[in-house]
């Protein structure tokens, strides 16, 4: 039974039992930014189990795409070296949300395995939690599993409920016992049943885990029964396929065999049992589906994990002798195997292929150098009898050549060598400290503040009359007063000043009363809820306890708000134009512009930029209101608000609806989209692999920018004596004229060179039957020099010629040697002889070569030496 049929039979079986088939969710968890990747079937139902979400069904079944690489669940190191570890796998599951419980879950599992998949009942063993008598009795008395094949597993991990057979979502929350089903491969395979000292052998293989969520665990560890217990089961498709196809390794199933054969084809390897082929076959699945779900290779977070997987696959191909990009070519083979089950893979095939190709090309630019350094170090280590690679070298490979530590460790492991990871960590820590020291210094860093939080009024007000000074800092130290001319940080109990956060710069403005004026140059966070006003006291003395009027620069705030709101609209427009893989990777919003970094693997075309601008300006013209709501985080995400991975959100979040955009945001914004005025993209480029940057301006800045463009167009039109509307046509005419004149000039140079060539032929000196000529051809370019040399060779019949020209301090050289003389006099050697004397070098064929130089003053002497150089070789 093929893997595709196994998947289909599983889903159809549970559909026949009243389950709704739910499509696989994304590998990027949409409801949990703290989770790196979707790693099990229950992830998309987490809020349902917690009671925070309801679905229109109480029974569900899925084939969930899952990844375990990076973070807590990381199988990367073992992939390719064991029979059952993968970075990507499919988890088949059935779920009950307060519907059926243990009895039905157990009977369903047994019926599917024995009646649908036709597994022999006497090959199946089960485990239960040691005091779960209910599950034990169902297996023994209802299903009929003999007692010797039902094993009770206790708390085998050092604490109460710490057991292979007790599942918990976290330290608190839903939890409960589980029952695992094992397949016995028979006595010919080493290993013992679960719970025995030999349980790690390959004879008894876990194929299905049935989790019974029946308790809620509180912070004190107390267990209370859930009013509606739930069921969460998981069976790895690859594992059950290995059992049903009578093989002992997941890599021997049909799905993997096709990918392994494709990997062998691309690497030129005949041995299909090679572990490196298994690595490549596994990794193409993980990499392709991660890219399908919007992850782009990068240097942090999910992107960094993807980059590590890609580079590990490339390194294994390199190890097999494949020294050029090959990995991306396997996408088509993966689509052939899995495209029917996952149409999104087939749809994204061109983009996935392109992303992988670009990543391969980047890595191959550095891999050879890095590998040569590592190989040399390992050879030296082996000669010295060492078994530990220097951590500093491992860090250099990581930092300079893009080798992740685990890739270096992989190479070392094959040689029986370990990496000094503590030394690597020390080097990494030093670099981070240096980066911090070199980074922008924040005036609020290191301030010790223990008072009350600041109340922020900036969403509603631009000034606050009765703000009280609660703390003052000068050069990082807490002080009681600040004198005129001193720079300081002021903390108020109330403020309208927005502190730099979420990419938006802090406000500027003034703190003042009748006797004091403090100019605020920046506003920063001292702590999460404490705002510091950094600036200089221009007048008077400011003391703790003073009351001031806090007033922001309203015009600057308004320009910043326009740019911030435009960023939200641009983000949505980019996703509409380029695809849902576009995700914000960074931003800077100030009064002059917005700078937006996002995941995308290709430069934006002019048409794409125009479309983004048109969409944003359409939203501006709609003059839609900005609607702000504060709500629970879960409600916001369920309502479609974008939550960005890596951002920290509290239980309550601020949601901004602006036109067609909905995002979580704590920044300041316009009241209506029309307040943005005009939106214009002024720059687009790449900042890192897979990361693009767009800069845009709004409002009066955009108007001035367009006016300046208009002025330049008018000036250019006037200079070319044309109307602005005729400018492109006029430029085309001028270009045609230039081409015509250049052609005429070339013809003149050719005629001049021809006439000079006739004169030069008379200067040739015969040496040993060969005419030797070394001369300067005034005003000639490289093309003219070559043509003249060819004509002289024809004219002189047997010759060795060097012609030179000087233009703008640079020397051009062409050497030509006729066929009869080129056995002894090589044109490449001849031109190099001259070039080396004029500060250059060159080379070419024995009959024709060229070179250049930077010291024209030495040219006469160099040419004078040609006769003697040729004579010495004849």
UniProtKB/Swiss-Prot annotation:
PROSITE patterns: AA_TRNA_LIGASE_II_ALA. GO terms for cellular component: cytosol. GO terms for biological process: alanyl-tRNA aminoacylation; negative regulation of DNA-templated transcription. Binds 1 zinc ion per subunit. Zn(2+) binds at residues 564, 568, 665, 669. It is found in: Cytoplasm. Its cofactor is Zn(2+). The keyword Disulfide bond does not apply. Its EC number is 6.1.1.7. Keywords: Aminoacyl-tRNA synthetase, ATP-binding, Cytoplasm, Ligase, Metal-binding, Nucleotide-binding, Protein biosynthesis, RNA-binding, tRNA-binding, Zinc. Gene3D superfamilies: 2.40.30.130, 3.10.310.40, 3.30.54.20, 6.10.250.550, Bira Bifunctional Protein, Domain 2, Threonyl-trna Synthetase, Chain A, domain 2. One of its GO terms (molecular function) is alanine-tRNA ligase activity. It catalyses: tRNA(Ala) + L-alanine + ATP = L-alanyl-tRNA(Ala) + AMP + diphosphate. Belongs to the class-II aminoacyl-tRNA synthetase family. PANTHER family: ALANINE--TRNA LIGASE, CYTOPLASMIC, ALANYL-TRNA SYNTHETASE. Catalyzes the attachment of alanine to tRNA(Ala) in a two-step reaction: alanine is first activated by ATP to form Ala-AMP and then transferred to the acceptor end of tRNA(Ala). Also edits incorrectly charged Ser-tRNA(Ala) and Gly-tRNA(Ala) via its editing domain. Consists of three domains; the N-terminal catalytic domain, the editing domain and the C-terminal C-Ala domain. The editing domain removes incorrectly charged amino acids, while the C-Ala domain, along with tRNA(Ala), serves as a bridge to cooperatively bring together the editing and aminoacylation centers thus stimulating deacylation of misacylated tRNAs. This is Alanine--tRNA ligase. The gene is alaS.
